[in-house]
Amino acid sequence: MKKTTYLLILLCSLLCTACVHSATKAALGKLVGSDRDEHGCIPSAGYTWSYALHDCVRLWEAGMRFDSGPQQIFLVYSTDSTFAEIFPTEGKSIICKRVKSTNSWKNKKGKESVYINNGIVCVKMNDFTYTQKK
């Protein structure tokens, strides 16, 4: 009787240990921050790829916020100010190239543009002009 009880307890212990191990393994497979995009950025940590900066950035840290329009957008300049990159709330970012000897950047494919008017940064996108808050 003691041997049977001992074997039953041993069997239950092994089963419980196996269940805990598989649950732990499943949890480790989905760690926060383990997701990476094609550029190596971690979206769950707030990072997105910037073509203007050629780096993973957090938009609220590296960019200028514009929320005076129908959607919130962010603007990031390249280090040499050759490019301005617009990040809309939805969709892909939009690259605008600087027009020589001016304070304006234009997108070749669309109507989007960035310009500085009397020291105020303006972003024109989807027939709406976003202005920087002071």
Each model region followed by its residue ranges:
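Residue-level signal for mature regions of secreted extracellular proteins and peptides
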Residues: 9-12, 34, 49
